[in-house]
């Protein structure tokens, strides 16, 4: 429940776009590229074409497997973003690109499964993370760390994005009808105890 609360609470301030009245709305996308596109050129090309069509102002990405900061910059340039940041260059990095300058506020690995990246762009604080895929108790600790970080730093105009490895209430009916998924989730939790 804390994950949903966390997302809901910090999305509210940006529903008004976080910008002065009269400005256009901000277009933001959070996207999991699934294991660095698995080195599949056609998946990468399809992603770039789709992103070009969406024209986001800000794009957060998870699972930037195999990406360096330079690689992320190259990808960003292919859909028109000049600014980018990545939390790390090994494992399963998270990153963000923007059509406006980015200021990196914090890159944190400690306490996070894949890391937490905090940047400022478009006048907003943007946090990108990828929570534990295996252990709900660890995810809960990560969510609590995010909540504390946001409160301690008084981030009033903040958006948290990424892969929370949690199902939305919208998915509940689907999850309940797929026994194998439920079995897998229970198995993963048991393996972590």
Where are these regions (language model features)?
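Sec-dependent N-terminal signal peptides
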Residues: 2-12
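N-terminal, active-site-proximal structural segment of metallo-dependent hydrolase catalytic domains
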Residues: 4, 16-75
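Loop/turn elements at helix/coil->beta-strand transitions in domains of secreted/extracellular proteins
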Residues: 23-27, 54-57, 79-81, 124-125, ...
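Active-site-proximal beta-strand elements of phosphoester/diester hydrolases
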Residues: 25-37, 122-132, 161
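Active-site environment of divalent metal-dependent phosphoester hydrolases
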Residues: 36-38, 66-70, 134-136, 165-172
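Charged helix-capping and loop-helix junction motifs
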Residues: 44, 141-146
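Structured beta-strand-rich core segments of catalytic domains in phosphoester-bond hydrolases
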Residues: 62-135
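Metal-dependent phosphoesterases centered on the DNase I-like endonuclease/exonuclease/phosphatase
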Residues: 144-193
């Amino acid at each position: 429940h804390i994950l949903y609360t966390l997302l809901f609470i910090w999305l509210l301030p940006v529903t008004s776009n976080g910008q002065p009245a009269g400005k256009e709305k901000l277009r933001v996308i959070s996207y999991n590229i699934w294991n660095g596109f698995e080195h599949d050129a056609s998946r990468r090309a399809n992603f770039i074409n789709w992103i070009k069509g969406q024209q986001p102002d800000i794009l957060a990405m998870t699972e930037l497997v195999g990406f360096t900061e330079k690689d992320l910059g190259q990808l960003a340039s292919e859909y028109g973003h000049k600014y980018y940041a990545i939390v790390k260059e090994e494992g399963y990095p998270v990153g963000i690109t923007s059509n406006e300058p980015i200021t990196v506020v914090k890159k944190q690995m400690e306490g996070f499964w894949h890391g937490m990246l905090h940047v400022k762009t478009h006048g907003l604080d943007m946090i990108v993370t990828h929570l534990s895929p295996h252990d709900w108790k660890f995810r809960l600790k990560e969510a609590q760390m995010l909540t504390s970080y946001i409160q301690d730093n008084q981030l009033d105009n903040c958006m948290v994005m990424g892969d929370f490895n949690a199902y939305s209430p919208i998915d509940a009916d689907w999850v309940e009808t797929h026994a194998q998924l439920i079995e897998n989730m229970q198995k993963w939790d048991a393996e972590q105890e």
